[in-house]
Structure formats: C-alpha cells, structure tokens
Amino acid sequence: MLGLTLREISAALKQGQVSPIELCQRCLSRIKETKFLNAYITVTEERALKQAAESEKRYEKGQELGVLDGIPFSVKDNFSTAGIETTCASNMLKGYVPPYNATVVQKLLDQGAVLMGKTNLDEFAMGSGSTDGVFGPVRNPWSYSKQYRGKGSPDSSQEDQEPQWLVAGGSSGGSAAAVAAFTCFVALGSDTGGSTRNPAAHCGVVGLKPTYGLVSRHGLIPLVNSMDVPGILTRCVEDAAIILEVLAGHDPKDSTTVQDLVSPLALPSSVDISKLCIGIPKEYRAEGLSCETQAFWTRAADLFQSAGARVIEVSLPHTSYSIDCYHVLCTAEVASNMARFDGLEYGHRCNRDVSTEAMYAATRREGFNDVVRGRILSGNFFLLKENYNDYFIKAQKVRRLIANDFIHVFSSGVDVLLTPTTLSDAVPYLEFIKEDNSTRSAQDDVFTQAVNMAGLPAVTVPAARSKRGLPVGLQFIGRAFCEQQLLTVAKWFEQEVRFPALCLEDLTEAGLVAARHEKSVSVS
C-alpha cells in the first residue's frame, strides 16, 4: 500500500480499500520503524491524525478535495509551518515557531494532504550530504538494502551488524530519505544548486527542480534569493507532475512568480520519441565522473537513439567557470540573507550581559556552525568595495554567459538535455566527512548548479543500480516553463528503465538491528 503511486493510493482511498486515518497510521509506523535514518527533525503525529480524520469525513460524504486528499507528505525544515517549529537544522532557529505556512505547504494542505513532519537537512541548507545539521546526519535508506549489504559494505559480514552507512545527499537528504523509506508519498525540498536533485539521485527517487518563478518561494527561508526554488521529491515522475500542477502559479506574496496562468501539466500516456532531439553536453564529461555513471549516461543516450530520437553532442562552453561563479554569487547572497539573524527579532539570542555589538557577535557565534560562518565570511569578502567589481560583478556577467549557453542550445532545436546528476553513487559517511563541506559541495554540485543560475527546470530520474547495488540518477534539463515536455520525456525514460524501489522488508530488518545496537550501547 505504501509503495503505490498518488493516483493508485487516491483510488484506494476513494474505493474504501484504506481510510485516510489507516494510511496516516501506517506512515507514522514507518517513521518510527525507520527512526534510525534520522530523516525527520519533527514528527507531527497528533496534527497528522487530526488532518487524516478530517479527510476521512470528507471521503465519507463523497466530498474529497481531489487526488491529494488524505495523502501523507513531509516538508523540509526550512519551510515555514504555522504552529510547528522550523529550525533549518540550526541552533539559531531552535524553538522558532512561525505564525504562517509557506505558500507551497498551504497549497498542499488546501488539497487535503496530511503533513507528517519536518525533514532533516544541512544547516540552513548549506551542504551536499545532509551531514552538517545540529540534529545529526541523515542515513541513506539504501545503506540497508540487501544488494549493498551483500556487495558494497565492508562491515556487513555479520547479519546482526550495521553496514557502513551511506550519506543521503543534500541538502534535502531528509526529504529524499523520507520518500525512499515509504514514510510519505511526497516530500518538499529546496533547490539552490542541486539540493533536491542530488539527494534524490542518491536515494533512488525522482527529484524535480521547477523553473525559477513557477513556484512560490514565500515562506522558504532564503539561502540565495535569485536561485532558490522549492523542489519536489516523489517515487515516480507522474507523481511529481501532479504535485507541480498544485504548486505552480502566481503568488501575490512572491513578486518573482509568473503572472501568466499555468497550463495543465497532465502527462500523456504515450509519446513519440522520434520527434525529439536530445542534447548531450560534452563539457559534462567532468573530472571525477565515475566509469559506471558514464556508462549509464551513454546507455541512456543509446536508448533514446534506438527509439528514434535524434541524439546530438552539444556545447555549453562556459561550464568550466560555473562552479566558481556559483560560489561567489551564492556566498554573497548568503552573507546578505544571514544578516537578519541577529538575536533581536526571532531565533537564538545569547544571554550574556554585554553591549549590543558584542551580543550580535556572540549570538551568531553560538547560533551558526562553522560552515555557515565560513560562507558569510566569503560572501562579505566578495562584497567589499575593493573586491565588488572583480568578484561579484564579474560573476554576474559570467552567470549571464552560462544562461546564454543554454538559450543557444535550446534555440538550435534541442528539446531536452541529458546529463549525469552526480559524479557517482552515494559514498559512505566516514569517507564523505574526510573532505570539508566546501570541497564536497563543489564536487557534488558540478552537474546541477548551472541550471539554477540559468533558472531552468531539471529533473533527476533513477536510471540504474551500480555494482554496489546503489541508485544512480540521470538528469534531464528543459526549456524554461516547459515542464510538461521535460516530465513527459523523463516519464518515458522511467518506464523504459523500470528502476526497482527499495525493499520495505530490508528497512524493517535494519530497524530491528539498529534498535538492538542502540540497546546494547545504552546497557554498556
């Protein structure tokens, strides 16, 4: 039941095969069984059951609100939720309870969806592993798959021993893990440079970054205003399209959203691939790209070609500058956005009896981790009067060149670009933390951040399993506001590769092992 698509579970609810309360209880049980993944910061059990009960009354009267009525969903903990603590996984916002819902959260609630809780992330969404938040790292559910335990984990020789667990990707790792572990049917993430697509690829789920301006950012605690986009994580492409249709559209509370009416996003059941042109950017054969991922990428291109599509190599000539450009622009906006956390209006405030300036400094020292403080420092350096033209202005000009590269390719007749999402499959946590956050992020964002700078839509789809039995995702990039075409192509690919979902039983067994380990540690 928990592995059904949105349309399937909606039909089951309508036919009375399961009630909204029963479905909510099953998801709550899954959350408890998979607590060891650390996917959630806050579980809103009481509120979820109340919302499910209200949904059940609507179904009994035949007045359900639509396909999402009674459907459990989760939200990354950098979206405001009325009456529910919103922390950004930071000491700075521990205890902060917003008085309003983010627009995307409210839209789902208005459709009768049931909020299960707030998911874990890197502090203030600054990271690519979901390892740097104050609530601890998120574990990738695939760490506990039989394929990985049998092939890839050096610590898995004994059945009663935990494997060397993998990172979930970031910064929306909690949302990706929550969907992959069947604790909800949909999760919201955020995507500034790949923070939805990266963890989706590592956790074997679909991750959609919409066109900038298609979905409201109101209530999303900002990282980089000019690049932030709410992301959607689901277990299949059509589910992502259903959610996007609900979320898309103008919001008077967000001046950057489109004014035009959004076209319906229903995906056709079949598509003539022979009419498409698929572009393969030659610059994306990047240093560090694993041989396996390269092979899956080539195989996917061959799949389109054998179906009649025109597959051509294209050039995005300014790609090599994109990571450095992204770093300058990202940290500059971070420095500006983080200035609001000063200990006065909301969030953490140091309790020392000191001057106002000393209070500011102490509050930020106590509230932010080293990663956040480091990015603030870098951003302020780039914004100094003597550096502004050489760094910030120059980076803005390069950003325009990067966006123009995409415009040129799409105007030449290319419909969709096909690229890797990540350099490789997920890595073990102990290996991941050997490198600092900045280095890791630069590596992990290499295929994803240029899309944010260009404001384009992109979706990652699980493509294959590596030799270690882990998911490898491929990314499709489309023209601005052409999500229907993008998702139609992605759906066709998804149906062709038929990627298998994670086995529910594997996670249940892993939960029992984790519980035994926890018990033995507490006893000793």
Swiss-Prot record:
UniProt-annotated stretches for the region Disordered: 146-168
Active site: 76, 171, 195
Enzyme Commission (EC) number: 6.3.5.7
Swiss-Prot/TrEMBL keywords: ATP-binding, Ligase, Mitochondrion, Nucleotide-binding, Protein biosynthesis
The keyword ATP-binding is annotated on this UniProt entry: yes
One record GO biological process: regulation of protein stability
Any one cellular-component term (Gene Ontology): mitochondrion
Subcellular localization: Mitochondrion
Reaction equations catalysed: L-glutamyl-tRNA(Gln) + L-glutamine + ATP + H2O = L-glutaminyl-tRNA(Gln) + L-glutamate + ADP + phosphate + H(+)
Entry GO MF terms: ATP binding; glutaminyl-tRNA synthase (glutamine-hydrolyzing) activity
Primary location recorded for the protein, binned into one broad class: mitochondrion
Sequence similarity: Belongs to the amidase family. GatA subfamily.
Quaternary structure (record): Subunit of the heterotrimeric GatCAB amidotransferase (AdT) complex, composed of A (QRSL1), B (GATB) and C (GATC) subunits.
Xref: HAMAP family: GatA
Annotated PANTHER family: GLUTAMYL-TRNA(GLN) AMIDOTRANSFERASE SUBUNIT A, MITOCHONDRIAL, TRANSAMIDASE
Protein name from the UniProt record: Glutamyl-tRNA(Gln) amidotransferase subunit A, mitochondrial
Source organism (scientific name): Ornithorhynchus anatinus (Duckbill platypus)
Lineage: Eukaryota, Metazoa, Chordata, Craniata, Vertebrata
